[in-house]
């Protein structure tokens, strides 16, 4: 019998289920969404009045060894009101925006809440758009799309090249030291100190009271993995309802009113959710300077030892790195599992072997397992709107949280996922006519994702991700390949031998994969990969059978958009960038560095 989970405090996940004659399934939580306020600046003001001295955000300034710098709820409210007052003085037209170039910081949050209070939509973007150099194509695209009247770059010296070489039109720049910049296109460059010194009065109060639930408050960019990013319109209603359903379902177990640690970028909805979810729960968020990548993860590990949070969130690659560290470091194991009650993963599926490995470590350390959950959602749904909040040992995408209605439309052996609820976007900025493609005839948002049941006879056991419909491709013989689902299966089969992989084979005779190995691929390692894949291939058809494996040495490139801010791989971009590696998989006869699986007599045989 498996050890118990640490105590959780989840509400009922009972669903009302309707099955139509055409196979379509409609699922709605029986539990209604709790009442909530559709005005985040008012939420901030209320928290500041209730506990003005409590830490809201904390950051390290000057590197991982620097002390934490704390910002209380009272300080955040005062600072954001000053910024709002300054914005209101600029008398900006309603079709403009505020563009945030900087990453996660206390000042970033104040600027964002200040823009909300002044009813000027804010658009936080990946720092890579401004820092990676080149022709700044994505940054220029965003500028043309959101038409910023104000640009915020916290440290002008860090963004100097972009600020001097990109045309920002007639925008005003807010930065720490305008004097470090040479010639720019900005109409005016203003110091941050001057902005936050602005006196806030009744004008700010009136602006906050005038906020309506359905006006644009944020423009959040899509990942842009297959095209230039779109700007998703996010409203106060979207954000508030999404935050409310998360608190209702996960908040008590996760301890969002306590200390939180998170690195996820605020230019992405998951990171932005954590920042605002902490606010609406009255908690304290410590901004993690670490990242789940070699050379950057040690800071996260040190922070975990210090803070020992109840809740931890990361991408699957981060959990793989954490499991490695936990196995090496007894002190980390003791401190990490001491208070942990809930672990959340996102960005990709969590391989079952990694889940089992993590639970083994938890049981060895504290005698109980840790409940894992995940959120399913998109930029268009504010953030995660489905979650695992019911007893299960299976990974997946869970069930709808209160307030969301799920529509499952049959698609071969899977279901297309469609969603409806107050957390769904009204559309994209400057994309008239797009709504007809975004929504079906009943008003459900078409996610483009597919799912299957963990148990076809029992919806209550939840759903699991079955790939992006847009990631499907055909082999040369016309056989369809569900690449997203296949990738998740392979990650599970090959964990922990590999970090990630690319599925190859579009218009080819057979499937191959390119993998990022977890160690140098010596003969023993190659043999282990071959044995795993030979077992994996047993009983599988051409749409899932892997014939060859290539080993990648260059890590996924952030600058080339191969990896998103949240750490997931953009398969299409990576395959295009590594076309030479893909072609090498199909050279005849097979080249020596490519591993052949399952008796392909055109290359190296599997040694068993």
Task: Please give the residue ranges for each predicted region.
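Conserved AMP-binding/adenylation subdomain of ANL enzymes
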Residues: 240-259, 267-331
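Conserved ATP-dependent adenylate/AMP-binding module captured primarily in the ANL superfamily
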Residues: 129-167, 183-186, 199-201, 242-261, ...
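Conserved AMP-binding A3 loop
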Residues: 69-74, 208-210, 217-244
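Conserved pre-ATP/AMP-binding loop-to-beta segment of ANL
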Residues: 52-55, 174-175, 180, 187-221, ...
């Amino acid at each position: 019998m498996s050890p118990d989970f640490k105590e959780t405090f989840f509400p009922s996940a009972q669903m009302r289920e309707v099955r139509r004659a055409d196979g379509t399934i409609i699922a709605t939580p029986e539990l209604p969404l709790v009442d909530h306020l559709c005005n985040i600046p008012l939420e901030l003001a209320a928290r500041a009045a209730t506990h003005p001295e409590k830490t809201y955000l904390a950051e390290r300034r000057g590197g991982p060894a620097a002390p934490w710098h704390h910002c209380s709820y009272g300080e955040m409210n005062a600072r954001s009101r000053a910024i709002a007052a300054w914005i209101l003085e600029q008398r900006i037209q309603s079709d403009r925006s505020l563009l945030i170039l900087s990453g996660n910081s206390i000042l970033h949050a104040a600027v964002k809440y200040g823009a909300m209070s002044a009813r000027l939509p804010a658009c936080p973007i990946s720092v890579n758009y401004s820092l990676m150099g080149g022709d700044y194509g994505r940054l220029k695209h965003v500028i043309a799309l959101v038409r910023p009247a104000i640009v915020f770059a916290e440290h002008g010296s860090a963004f100097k090249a972009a600020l001097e070489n990109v045309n920002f039109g007639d925008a005003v720049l807010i930065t720490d030291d305008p004097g470090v910049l040479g010639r720019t296109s900005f109409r005016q460059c203003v110091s941050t100190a001057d902005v936050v010194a602005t006196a806030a009065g009744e004008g700010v109060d009136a602006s906050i009271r005038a906020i309506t639930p359905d006006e644009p408050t944020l423009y959040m960019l899509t990942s842009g993995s297959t095209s230039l990013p779109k700007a998703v319109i996010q409203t106060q209603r979207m954000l508030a309802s999404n935050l409310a359903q998360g608190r209702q379902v996960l908040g008590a177990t996760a301890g969002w009113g306590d200390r939180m640690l998170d690195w996820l970028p605020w230019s992405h909805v998951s990171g932005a959710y954590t920042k605002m979810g902490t606010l609406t729960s009255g908690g304290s968020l410590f901004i993690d300077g670490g990242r789940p990548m070699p050379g950057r993860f040690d800071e996260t590990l040190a922070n975990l030892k210090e803070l020992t949070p109840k809740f931890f969130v990361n991408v699957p690659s981060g959990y793989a790195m954490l499991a490695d560290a936990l196995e090496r470091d007894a002190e980390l194991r003791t401190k990490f599992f001491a208070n942990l009650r809930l672990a959340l993963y996102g960005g990709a599926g969590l391989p079952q072997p990694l889940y089992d490995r993590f639970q083994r470590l938890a049981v060895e350390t504290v005698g109980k397992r840790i409940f894992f959950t995940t959120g399913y959602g998109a930029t268009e749904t504010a953030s995660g709107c489905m979650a695992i909040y019911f007893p299960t040992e299976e990974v997946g995408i869970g069930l709808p949280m209160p307030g969301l209605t799920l529509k499952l439309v049959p698609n071969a052996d899977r279901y297309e996922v469609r969603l409806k609820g107050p957390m769904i976007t009204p559309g994209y900025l400057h994309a008239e006519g797009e709504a007809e493609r975004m929504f079906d005839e009943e008003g459900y948002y078409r996610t483009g994702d597919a799912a299957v049941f963990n148990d076809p006879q029992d919806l209550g056991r939840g759903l699991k991700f079955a790939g992006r419909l847009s990631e499907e491709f055909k082999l040369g013989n016309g056989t369809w390949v569900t690449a997203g689902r296949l990738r998740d299966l392979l990650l599970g089969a090959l964990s922990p031998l590999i970090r990630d992989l690319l599925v190859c084979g579009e218009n080819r005779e057979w499937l191959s994969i390119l993998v990022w190995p977890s160690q140098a691929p010596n003969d023993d390692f190659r043999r282990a990969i071959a044995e795993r894949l030979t077992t994996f291939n047993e009983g599988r058809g051409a749409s899932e059978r892997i014939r060859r494996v290539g080993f990648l040495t260059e890590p996924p490139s952030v600058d080339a958009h191969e990896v998103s801010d949240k750490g997931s791989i953009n398969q299409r971009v990576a395959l295009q960038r590594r076309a030479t590696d893909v072609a090498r998989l199909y050279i005849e006869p097979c080249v020596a560095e490519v591993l052949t699986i399952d008796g392909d007599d055109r290359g190296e045989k599997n040694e068993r």
